[in-house]
Amino acid sequence: MSSLRQIAFYGKGGIGKSTTSQNTLAALAEMGQKILIVGCDPKADSTRLILHAKAQDTILSLAASAGSVEDLELEDVMKVGYKDIRCVESGGPEPGVGCAGRGVITSINFLEENGAYENIDYVSYDVLGDVVCGGFAMPIRENKAQEIYIVMSGEMMAMYAANNISKGILKYANSGGVRLGGLICNERQTDKELELAEALAKKLGTQLIYFVPRDNVVQHAELRRMTVLEYAPESQQADHYRNLATKVHNNGGKGIIPTPISMDELEDMLMEHGIMKPVDESIVGKTAAELAAS
C-alpha cells in the first residue's frame, strides 16, 4: 500500500471550501484512491455532498449521547458514501461554549485508535479557516495534516485569510512536517482574479494549484446534495475537478514552507493590480460636511 497522504483544505468561511474539497475528493475516488474525510468545521457540512445528507451526526454529539467517546464504536460515527468514501464529522461545541479544536483532536485520536486510517490512501481534513485559533489549527499543530491546500478567491478577505493560514503553517512547519501544498482559487468573477491569485501564490512562495471557474452546475448539484462528478459527470465543471484532483495527486512531497506577507504588502499588491486605490490621508476622519466645506 502507498503511504498515507494526510491533506487538509483550509479557507475563509463561505468561500466554497467544503464544496471544492468534496468534488476534488470524489474525483480522487474515481481515480481509485481510498478516501477518508474528517470534517473539522462546526457546520458539519464537510460530507453532505458525498452522503446526500443534510448534516452528518458528529463524534462529539454521539459521544454526548452515549456518555463518552470511549462508549462509541467506529461504525457509530463513520458513514460510507459516493465511491466508497468514508465520512466522519468531528463536530463542535454549542456556539459560545468551549473550544472546537478540542473536539477536533478528540475525534482524530478516536479515529486513529479505532483503525479508521487503515487501508486508506488519503485522509482529508476540512477546516474552517477565518480564525487560525489554536483550536482550528489542531490538525496542523498535532502534526496530523501534512499538506495544506488553501481555497481562496480574488476577494480581499479571502486573500487575507489565505495569508493568515500561511502564518499558521509557518509557525508549525519546523516543529512538524506540515507544508503548504498550494492555493486553489474558487472563482468569484471579481476583477483580475486569476492575476491576483497567481500574485499571492508567488508572494507566499507557493503555486496556484488550480483556478476553478464559476459554473451554476455546482449550485444545481448542491441543491440535490451531490457532487458535480455524480450529478453531471460529463460536464466541463466535472472535468475541472478531475484536473484539480490530478494536480493534487501529483503534488505529493512538493509542499513548501510559506512566506506570508504583511497587511501593507497585501494592500500594495491590490494597488499594483488596480483593485485598491491609495488612501488620501488628508480625507481620513473627515465628515461629508467637512469635505464639502474644504
From Swiss-Prot:
Which GO terms of the molecular function aspect are on file?
4 iron, 4 sulfur cluster binding; ATP binding; metal ion binding; nitrogenase activity
Q: How is the cofactor bound?
A: Binds 1 [4Fe-4S] cluster per dimer.
- Enumerate the UniProt keywords alphabetically: 4Fe-4S, ADP-ribosylation, ATP-binding, Iron, Iron-sulfur, Metal-binding, Nitrogen fixation, Nucleotide-binding, Oxidoreductase
What cofactor is this protein dependent on?
Answer: [4Fe-4S] cluster
Which InterPro entries does the annotation name? NifH/chlL_CS (IPR030655), NifH/frxC (IPR000392), Nitrogenase_Fe_NifH (IPR005977), P-loop_NTPase (IPR027417)
Spell out the post-translational modification annotation for this entry.
The reversible ADP-ribosylation of Arg-102 inactivates the nitrogenase reductase and regulates nitrogenase activity.
Q: Which reaction does it catalyse?
A: N2 + 8 reduced [2Fe-2S]-[ferredoxin] + 16 ATP + 16 H2O = H2 + 8 oxidized [2Fe-2S]-[ferredoxin] + 2 NH4(+) + 16 ADP + 16 phosphate + 6 H(+)
Residue numbers of ADP-ribosylarginine PTMs = R102
How would you classify this enzyme at the top EC level?
oxidoreductase
CDD domains, per the entry: NifH (cd02040)
Q: Which Pfam families match?
A: Fer4_NifH
Q: Where does [4Fe-4S] cluster bind?
A: C99, C133
Please list the GO biological process terms of this entry: nitrogen fixation
User: What Enzyme Commission number(s) does the record list for this chain?
Assistant: 1.18.6.1
UniProt lists the family membership as follows: Belongs to the NifH/BchL/ChlL family.
Q: What NCBIfam families does its record include? A: nifH
Any idea what job this protein has? Answer: The key enzymatic reactions in nitrogen fixation are catalyzed by the nitrogenase complex, which has 2 components: the iron protein and the molybdenum-iron protein.
**HAMAP family per UniProt:** NifH (MF_00533)
Q: What is this protein called?
A: Nitrogenase iron protein
Q: Which organism is it from?
A: Bradyrhizobium sp. (strain ANU 289)
